[in-house]
Amino acid sequence: SFETITTPDPGQNFADQNLRFFPRSVTLPPNEAQVVKVQLLKTSELAPGEYRSHFYFRSVPKAKPLGEKETVKDSTSISVTLTPIFGITIPAIIRIGESNTFVSLSGLKLEVSDDGTPAFGLTFNRNGNFSVYGDLTVDHVSPQGKVTRVGMANGISVYTPNADRHFQFNLNKTAGVDYKSGKLLVAFSSSSDVKPAKLADGELVLQ
């Protein structure tokens, strides 16, 4: 169940009063797109910090005309009609002031299941006034120095006011990679197609 939050938690600010977007509803044919414009409002009145809200986009079921009656096929049984409603949320973040945020990685561990699937886990530790967002890569380095990309997870975030986030995902079962020897090099970088900036890194020696 969901709970409507009207008062931000300590250290958390909402951005909804400083955002305006349009259009608010559209009708899209198949394989068509729609540009949604977002406007910032009254940012000069905001105190330094991070303000976050979410845009929620969802499909709206086509309503039946009033007075239209459904055809009853079998009056002796009970039927249930499920109408799926698809939606997506996109964070909208306003940042005022200079960032003093940094992130570190801790608790690196690797567990191999009975079927041989390697599961890698770690903790993101966030410090500072802003959220962090980026992509995680894991490379295996063999004792002979061969580097193999064995895992990647995009779009990992640690939002304010949270100080840490525990994360785990499965690595690739790549031929020639021995998860009992060598080491894993872990890098957390900002999301960018041009030149990602490394935010944190770590190393796990395998044995």
Model regions and ranges:
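Short edge beta-strand/loop segments characteristic of extracellular beta-sandwich folds
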Residues: 119-127, 170
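Beta-strand-rich interaction surfaces with strong enrichment in secreted/lumenal proteins
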Residues: 11, 22-28, 93, 109, ...
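Low-complexity, acidic Ser/Thr/Pro/Gly-rich terminal tails and inter-domain linkers that flank the onset
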Residues: 96-113
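Short proline/glycine- and polar residue-rich coil/turn motifs
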Residues: 26-33, 155-165, 194-196
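Surface-exposed binding patches on compact interaction domains or structured appendages
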Residues: 1-38, 144
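Terminal connector regions
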Residues: 41-94, 175-207
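A short beta-turn/strand-edge loop motif at beta-sheet boundaries
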Residues: 128-133, 176-178
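Exposed aromatic-hydrophobic patches
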Residues: 37, 163-174
